[in-house]
Amino acid sequence: MTKQQMIAMFIAMIITSALVSAATIMGGIWYLNKQAQDSGETSSLLENSPLSFLVTEQPTSKGPSFHPLDKVVLSIKGKKQTHFVMLELAIETRRPERIKDIDNYMPMVQNSLLKLFSDKTFDELQQTGAIDILQNEVKQTLLVAFAKTDIVRDIDDVLLTKYVVQ
């Protein structure tokens, strides 16, 4: 046998061994669950083991859920006077249980929005299409603000639910 044939045979043996091992484990799990169901036990052997993820179903929310955030009032520059912007935001998620603590981050949200609006002018916010642009900017700002937290992966969208400029 040549060196290439030996390597090919060795790789084939490793793959075969891995497949047989995986099939044995899956067959054992199936057998144990089948035995538990046939014997009338209410819980299977795996439910209390480290392999419980194999038999438990993860609940998923079918539709989106919206979590409202506190109202944010900011000042913006005008030509002759200072104006105020009032925003109410909602976070869209499909995992509401994972963002239940988002209200604890409101100071971070307010700080991020304050930085975003510090460069805005009254005229910019009154232009046609400003709300769509602003919504995208607010979303990106909040995603950056939450980037160092676990919450960021559960935010599907950020919506402006109220927008008042005076």
Curated annotation (Swiss-Prot):
InterPro entries: FliL
Membrane protein topology class: Single-pass membrane protein
Chief localization: membrane
Keyword Magnesium: no
Record bears the keyword Cytoplasm: no
Alphabetical UniProt keywords: Cell inner membrane, Cell membrane, Chemotaxis, Flagellar rotation, Membrane, Transmembrane, Transmembrane helix
Intracellular or extracellular location(s): Cell inner membrane
Pfam families linked: FliL
Cellular component aspect of the GO annotation: bacterial-type flagellum basal body; plasma membrane
TM ranges: 6-26
Domain of life: Bacteria
Protein name, UniProt field: Flagellar protein LafL
Organism: Vibrio parahaemolyticus serotype O3:K6 (strain RIMD 2210633)
Lineage of the species this protein comes from: Bacteria, Pseudomonadati, Pseudomonadota, Gammaproteobacteria, Vibrionales
